[in-house]
């Protein structure tokens, strides 16, 4: 049979192709409804445990032990709040954040938001490229440069899934998350951290953030956890569920979507905390406080833990994390293009464009700075994401707090106050970092 590349946008990666594609029967039991609503949160959670998170958490754990563990927890709770606003916005209005921004802002402002959203997607994909390339390097022995080139072939995965239903995509993502989680569970069992010290790291210590280096890492953790493109992504994919347009159905959908978000991001929190705990217990505790590269962590795990299993699981989990953007990056790219520009292109082309734009800085960085600088490039990509975050947060909080737009589903005042406080905190941290850099 002759095969030809698709010339139109195709499911399951394009929002217009999968909107209202998962039916939720009104007479279904609460557990059945919850099971049907689980999925969008999983797609979002993948971005919360990507290689960028690994780089920041490994450096934070090796340099400062468990001291920045509370930042991981606070960043994850912040993500739960913001992603819940996204699902509320999408369900209440029937439109995603990109569509609403196009409708409610002047064309020049909306176009600027689109460019920033695209930049955040490329920055995210840069982290995935570097992470997957590192995994190929560690597991197969190829050079990191060769690994970067190999990541270009993930477009074939998008082609293989063309026409698949959305639940199949969510099942694949769940498999990736389960793989990552299982690997780190075994890692922690092998290492055996001292849990009272871990618990002490959960207590906020603002003095820790008073100097530039821990603040830089804290902002990197925040940028690696709460990603701008996830805000656009979540407000769109939550609309794949069909539960009715009446107020009662929307209220139920918001409640179940909130549970999906909290549950999925709790899994991501456990993975991110496990990475930092792993680095703190294995490296900081043994005096290796300068482990800032993922490949260094991989090679050190073997002699420190006393077996090849720990390092193999580490590399395998990294590969699973690196491949995750094949799905979420493609969907997010289509969301912002359809929402801001009303443009549709074949999903394999969208994937090729995003990956191509990420490959260029990845190759330049590796060839110019050397393969040993991959970890620094990963952390930098996460800081860039944090600097862009306020530009996506502003419209999200503003729209979800607008009673004229949201009706009875408008944010409670305390939620809006908390969200705006978070916006101010992130902006202040970013400005402080810029002052350290250029002041």
Swiss-Prot record:
Coiled-coil blocks: none
GO molecular function annotation: metal ion binding; metal ion transmembrane transporter activity; symporter activity
The entry's keywords: Cell inner membrane, Cell membrane, Ion transport, Membrane, Symport, Transmembrane, Transmembrane helix, Transport
Localization of this protein: Cell inner membrane
InterPro entries membership: NRAMP_fam
Chief site of localization: membrane
Transmembrane feature ranges: 64-84, 139-161, 171-191, 214-234, 262-282, 300-320, 359-379, 380-400, 418-438
A GO CC term attached to the entry: plasma membrane
Keyword rRNA processing among record annotations: no
Pfam families: Nramp (PF01566)
Membrane topology category: Multi-pass membrane protein
Protein's UniProt keywords contain Ribosomal protein: no
Family: Belongs to the NRAMP family.
PANTHER family per the UniProt record, alphabetical: MANGANESE TRANSPORTER SMF1 (PTHR11706:SF101), SOLUTE CARRIER PROTEIN FAMILY 11 MEMBER (PTHR11706)
Function according to Swiss-Prot or TrEMBL: H(+)-stimulated, divalent metal cation uptake system.
Protein name: Divalent metal cation transporter MntH 1
């Amino acid at each position: 049979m002759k095969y030809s590349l698709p010339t139109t946008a195709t499911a399951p990666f394009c929002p217009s192709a999968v909107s209202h594609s998962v039916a939720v029967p009104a007479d279904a039991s609460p557990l059945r409804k919850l099971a049907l609503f689980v999925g969008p949160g999983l797609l979002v959670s993948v971005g919360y445990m990507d290689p960028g998170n690994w780089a920041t958490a490994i450096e934070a754990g090796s340099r400062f032990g468990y001291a920045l563990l509370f930042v991981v927890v606070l960043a994850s709770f912040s993500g739960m709040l913001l992603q819940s606003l996204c699902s509320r916005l999408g369900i209440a209005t029937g439109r995603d954040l990109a569509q609403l921004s196009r409708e409610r802002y002047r064309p020049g402002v909306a176009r600027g938001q689109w460019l920033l959203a695209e930049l955040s997607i490329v920055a995210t994909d840069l982290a995935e490229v570097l992470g997957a390339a590192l995994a190929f390097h560690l597991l197969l022995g190829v050079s990191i440069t060769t690994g970067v080139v190999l990541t270009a072939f993930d477009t074939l995965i998008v082609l293989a899934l063309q026409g698949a239903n959305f639940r199949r995509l969510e099942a694949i993502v769940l498999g990736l998350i389960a793989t990552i989680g299982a690997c780190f569970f075994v890692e922690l069992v092998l290492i055996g951290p001292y849990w009272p010290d871990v618990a002490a790291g959960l207590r906020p210590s603002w003095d820790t953030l008073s100097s530039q280096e821990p603040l830089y890492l804290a902002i990197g953790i925040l940028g690696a956890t709460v990603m701008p493109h996830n805000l656009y992504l979540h407000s769109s994919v939550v609309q794949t569920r069909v539960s009715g347009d009446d107020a009662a159905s929307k209220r139920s959908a918001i409640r179940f979507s909130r549970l999906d978000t909290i549950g999925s991001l709790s899994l991501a929190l456990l993975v991110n905390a496990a990475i930092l705990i792993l680095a703190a217990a294995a490296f900081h505790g043994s005096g290796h406080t300068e482990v800032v590269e993922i490949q260094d962590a991989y090679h050190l795990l073997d002699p420190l833990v006393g077996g090849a299993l720990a390092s193999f699981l580490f590399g395998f989990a990294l590969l699973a994390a690196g491949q995750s953007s094949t799905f979420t990056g493609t969907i997010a790219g289509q969301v912002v293009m359809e929402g801001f520009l009303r443009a549709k292109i074949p999903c394999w082309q969208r994937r090729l464009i995003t990956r191509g734009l990420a490959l260029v800085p990845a190759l330049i960085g590796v060839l110019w700075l050397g393969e040993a600088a991959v970890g620094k490039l990963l952390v930098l990509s996460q800081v860039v994401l944090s600097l862009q975050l306020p530009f996506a947060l502003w419209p999200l909080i503003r729209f979800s707090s607008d009673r004229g737009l949201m009706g009875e589903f408008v944010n409670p005042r305390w939620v809006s106050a908390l969200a705006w406080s978070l916006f101010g905190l992130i902006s202040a941290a970013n400005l402080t970092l810029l002052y350290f850099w250029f002041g």
